């Protein structure tokens, strides 16, 4: 068999890679040879080739994200809707106990830093777009393709910008004084369509608008910090607020339990969840290892300071009952009480809507890149079409899928106010499951490469803390009253997350194990060059006596 030649697009011919594996036919339609990554293959040799070629392969979009753009991506993803909506459910699940409330926020920040350095170390080993998808499939290579297919399917099915969209719709209506909450869904859907078109038509213009909204968000962060300082030193409440209660007091008839603390942590950790987002677009970052080493910790520090100031403001201005009853609109209630209905209720609500809009743009941008990497692997139907940078040299198909799934969830969700909390918990539970696997995978990777030193190294204690905490977070919801973890006709959030993961497992089992075994064929990867230089994989059937 003739070896296959992959040209790296470099002037040095020594960087050409010859692949001596059976992969099927290669298309002869070549475009730019600054190619993206290609999939996991059928042999150990192909995996080695993949690791070798990943060093110099580039995406067609090029490296255009510097430190500022990366900080904007981090901050915009982290600070979306969470701090304006989640404090209500956290205070409720901690029983109004301020000591536990602030301890959860501090602990969440510490785990976020540990998780950030976990990803920074993995990212220094594997500096390419895909994030945890790449980390998992390089760590868990057996059973063949299991982790790749399961995580890929799960990521596509849960690839939505939902929580930010819900908050955006609610706060836009609040800013314009609309009391009919049924319109919030249509506002959310309209902006999702706008975001899909912006990123799907032009990468450059999409990033420009994203950076502009991110800049406004940074200004908002400064204003929020000043609001926290103002309430701490100058604001005088007219009655007893949550801040005035004893620090260890638990409210009567509270829901405080092991399970409720786990739910509170999931909600709090959700507010920091964007620390792993930028690794999904590593191939578009200039000098990714050094850039992420600076922008990652800086972004988390900025967000933690802002969160602390905002939490002080909530407790200094509002009562326990006001915070809990406000739900996702707790941010609007705070600023209305601070600055009056005209400034606080309108202007601040509009500002929060801008923050949520920035978050939506970043989430859709990041998810579309993950989806594109997944479709390039060829596991799912229509992968060739969904992975294309078409028709405007931007991944419109994968962006559109993210928008479609988000809109579908918005339409399906019940109207109850608990829908937001349910989504946060469901999304957080699934992410916690895969974060556990990534943390375990780092130790596997270190063992395989024990003679090599990464450019960035995560704390072993921090990684062990993530593993321990993740196990606790995954088990705790099963010890609670199931009715507390569900909404409408949907099952408890942890069951919903696990059902999606199990469905992804059965997809792998049927397509890559059972059907080939029963019908006597094996699946081999056929590598295809797209017109823009992307390398994608198709899985073709080859008869065998297996």
Curated annotation (Swiss-Prot):
The chain crosses the membrane at residues 71-91, 99-119, 149-169, 189-209, 214-234, 255-275, 298-318, 320-340, 347-367, 394-414, 424-444, 460-480, 495-515. The keyword Transport applies. Residues 1-70, 120-148, 210-213, 276-297, 341-346, 415-423, 481-494 are extracellular. It is found in: Membrane. The keyword Membrane applies. It is a multi-pass membrane protein. The gene is MUP3. Very low affinity permease for methionine. Signal peptide: none annotated. One of its GO terms (cellular component) is membrane. One of its GO terms (molecular function) is L-methionine transmembrane transporter activity. One of its GO terms (biological process) is methionine import across plasma membrane. This is Low-affinity methionine permease. To yeast high affinity methionine permease (MUP1). PANTHER family: AMINO ACID TRANSPORTER, LOW-AFFINITY METHIONINE PERMEASE. Keywords: Amino-acid transport, Membrane, Transmembrane, Transmembrane helix, Transport.
């Amino acid at each position: 068999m003739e070896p296959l030649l992959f040209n790296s697009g470099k002037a040095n011919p020594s960087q050409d890679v010859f692949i001596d594996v059976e992969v099927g036919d290669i298309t002869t339609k070549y475009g730019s040879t600054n190619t993206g990554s290609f999939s996991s293959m059928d042999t150990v040799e192909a995996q080695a080739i993949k690791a070798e070629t990943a060093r110099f392969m580039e995406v067609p979009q090029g490296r255009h994200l510097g430190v500022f753009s990366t900080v904007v991506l981090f901050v915009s993803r982290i600070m979306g809707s969470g701090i304006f909506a989640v404090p209500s459910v956290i205070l409720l699940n901690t029983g109004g106990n301020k000591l536990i409330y602030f301890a959860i926020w501090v602990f969440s920040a510490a785990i976020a830093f540990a998780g950030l350095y976990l990803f920074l170390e993995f990212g220094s080993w594997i500096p390419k777009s895909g994030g945890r998808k790449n980390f998992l499939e390089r760590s868990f290579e057996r059973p063949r393709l299991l982790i790749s297919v399961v995580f890929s399917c799960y990521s596509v099915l849960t690839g939505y910008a939902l929580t930010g969209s819900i908050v955006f719709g609610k706060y836009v209506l609040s800013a314009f004084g609309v009391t009919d909450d049924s319109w919030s869904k249509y506002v959310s859907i309209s902006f999702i369509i706008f975001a899909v078109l912006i990123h799907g038509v032009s990468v450059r213009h999409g990033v420009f608008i994203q950076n502009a909204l991110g800049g406004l968000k940074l200004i908002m962060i400064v204003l929020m910090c000043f609001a926290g300082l103002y309430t701490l030193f100058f604001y005088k409440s007219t009655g007893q607020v949550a801040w005035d209660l004893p620090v260890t007091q638990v409210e009567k008839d509270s829901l405080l339990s092991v399970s409720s603390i786990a739910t509170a942590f999931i909600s709090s950790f959700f507010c920091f969840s964007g620390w792993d987002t930028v690794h999904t677009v590593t191939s578009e970052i200039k000098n990714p290892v050094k850039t992420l080493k600076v922008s990652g910790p800086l972004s988390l520090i900025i967000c933690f300071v802002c969160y602390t100031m905002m939490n002080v403001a909530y407790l200094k201005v509002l009562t326990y009952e006001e915070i809990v009853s406000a739900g996702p609109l707790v941010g609007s209630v705070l600023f209305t009480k601070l600055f009056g209905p005209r400034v606080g209720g309108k202007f601040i609500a509009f500002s929060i809507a801008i923050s949520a809009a920035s978050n939506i743009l970043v989430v859709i941008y990041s998810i579309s890149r993950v989806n594109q990497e997944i479709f390039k692997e060829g596991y799912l139907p229509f992968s060739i079409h969904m992975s294309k940078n078409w028709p405007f040299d931007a991944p419109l198909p994968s962006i559109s899928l993210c928008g479609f799934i988000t809109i579908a969830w918005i339409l399906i969700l019940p109207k109850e106010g608990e829908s937001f909390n349910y989504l946060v918990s469901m999304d957080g539970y699934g992410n916690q499951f895969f974060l556990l696997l990534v943390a375990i995978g780092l130790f596997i990777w270190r063992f395989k490469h024990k003679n090599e030193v990464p450019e960035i190294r995560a704390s072993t204690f921090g990684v062990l803390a993530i593993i321990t905490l993740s196990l606790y977070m995954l088990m705790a919801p099963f010890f609670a009253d199931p009715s507390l973890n569900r909404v409408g006709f949907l099952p408890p959030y942890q069951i919903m997350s696990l059902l999606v993961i199990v469905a992804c497992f059965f997809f792998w089992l049927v397509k890559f194990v059972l059907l080939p075994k029963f019908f006597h064929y094996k699946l081999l990867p056929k590598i295809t060059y797209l017109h823009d230089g992307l390398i994608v994989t198709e899985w073709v059937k080859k008869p065998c006596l297996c």
